[in-house]
Amino acid sequence: MSDIIIAFILGIVEGLAEFLPISSTGHLILVGHLLGFEGERAKTFEIVIQLGAILAIAILYHKRLVSLCNIKPLIQKEKKFNAFHVFLGVFPAVVAGLLLHDIIKTYLFQPYTVVIGLVAGAILMIFAEVKKKEAAAYSLDDLTYRQALTIGLFQCLAVYPGFSRAGSTISGGLLAKVNYKTASEFSFLIALPVMIGATGLDLLKSWKYLSVDDIPMFAVGFITSFIVAMLAVVTFLKLLEKIGLKPFAYYRIFLAILFTLFVLL
């Protein structure tokens, strides 16, 4: 199979899975294994296509991101979504990521640990659906600092491969009385700085595996993940309010079974 086709397939996988509660890491490892695309070059490629997904969110939410530069609501203590909400949502994961980055990359990016993350994340999502209470926040402007911090703490779970950033944060939002749409949008926004920092750090360590010959493949993967991520996010927001998290949780368990059969055994 040609590199361009592999790039296209993995770009679709990344675009679909990055912001859905199904674990992009688990999917990329499984599909990469089935395609025979593994090793340091594959890891570097994954970093590049993650940047495509990040760009999709930056464009979709550019107005909201620009509004965060306005410090008036913060100074005047208005009940309006502001940069401090994002800080509270990002800070715990940044600390966890910096402290555990090398350990995670060295010991936790293993097939069996990803299976554990897939199942554990599914259990959390089902628990959040069962225990969720009537929402008190129906938009980002309704979000309290306490709810933002709660979601940020749940994002720490996503440093474990296979757990899923979206699954962790949306579950945390439901348990903190935030509705599906608001929890999802906040999840996307706080993912941006964390992902930019993590992918930037990884890219600094992996740039030596890049070569001029890789540019066409990496470009196809980047563009594909960008387009698919934009479509996936818009569709997911509409779908989540109708079906909730449980179908995604059941899919994760199914994926864990596939992972065990095709990668571990």
Regions inferred by a protein language model and the residue ranges of each:
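Multi-pass membrane proteins that catalyze or facilitate reactions on polyprenyl-/lipid-phosphate substrates
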Residues: 1-265
